[in-house]
Regions:
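Flexible "arm" and connector segments at domain edges
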Residues: 1-63, 67-110
């Protein structure tokens, strides 16, 4: 993930002259990147319903797409993957309901 985040940061700070999918997404900003995240999330859910080994492979690939596009969004906002890892580590061992309540979430029952 660190290597991917480095590439995203480089594309953001030094847009390449040659075509780059990451640079294209970054130019589109939150709207374009967000559209892809929503699209990929739906594909993850669809793949999760597919049976057997082929379904498993499809789920892995779609999840990789979702993580990739999420990483681009993070990079667009100058957030490193290590910050996400730190937040996940902070939450480890805490009930999801308790964690949501600590944020003052109105939807702590979700």
């Amino acid at each position: 993930m660190n290597a991917l985040m480095d590439v995203i940061s480089d594309r953001k700070n030094n847009p390449p002259a040659e075509p780059s999918y990451v640079a294209k997404l970054l130019r589109g900003g939150t709207a374009e990147i967000g559209f892809k995240i929503v699209e990929e999330a739906a594909e993850v859910v669809e793949a999760a319903d597919e049976p057997g080994a082929a379904g498993r492979v499809h789920l892995v690939k779609e999840t990789a797409d979702l993580v990739f596009h999420t990483a681009v969004m993070l990079g667009f906002h100058g957030i490193m993957w290590s910050e996400v890892e730190a937040e996940l580590a902070r939450r480890f061992g805490i009930s999801g309901i308790t964690e949501k309540q600590s944020r003052g979430s109105a939807s702590a029952n979700d």
